[in-house]
Amino acid sequence: QYSKRTWMKGICELLHEKDLVPKEKKDGTWSGIHWSGTSHATLHTPEILKMMRGAGCSHLVYGYESFSPHVMKTIGKGATPKTNIRSFFNTLEAGIRPIPNQIMGFPNEDFVSIRQNINAWNDLGIMVKPFFATPYPGSEWFSVYRNSIEKQYGGDLESFILDLGDATSITAVISHNFNAVE
């Protein structure tokens, strides 16, 4: 939206102009490029998605984070479960595979929000390996939860930072309702 939706259109047009869109050859091989990207659930239109597919886009990673209304409201994503679901189906309809990034362990995560996520995954027919909410240095969460992080790491912030390489592993827990075991 910041580019008034012109950049992606221009990129797709250039891929066609330079003859880089995927085409199957007679021998069964392909020429051109398949590509992917990331997007926000609110920043697409069905028209631009179809244009992207026609230019070779095979999948889009969406930072949906959660399908829980109360979690989405508190993390300030600017999206809702409804916009997440709408973008999921619009992307599928355009012939692009939507890949949802999901996060568990938000500060206000609870059993209700976890159940809402599981229900959405089942309803949408998607398999998800969620990431854990992580207070990266420089983020608001790091500032807010620094004392808690230091306690969890026995005062050794360097060990916490070294643990940050894999977002599918639990580092410092920032959930108000669950501990690392739960």
Residue ranges and their predicted role:
Residues 1-99, 104-106:
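Conserved SAM/AdoMet-binding glycine-rich loop
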Residues 6, 111-112:
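Short N-terminal helix/helix-N-cap motif within the alpha/beta-hydrolase-1
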Residues 44-46, 109, 137-139:
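Intrinsically disordered, low-complexity acidic/polar segments
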Residues 112-182:
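C-terminal accessory regions of radical SAM enzymes
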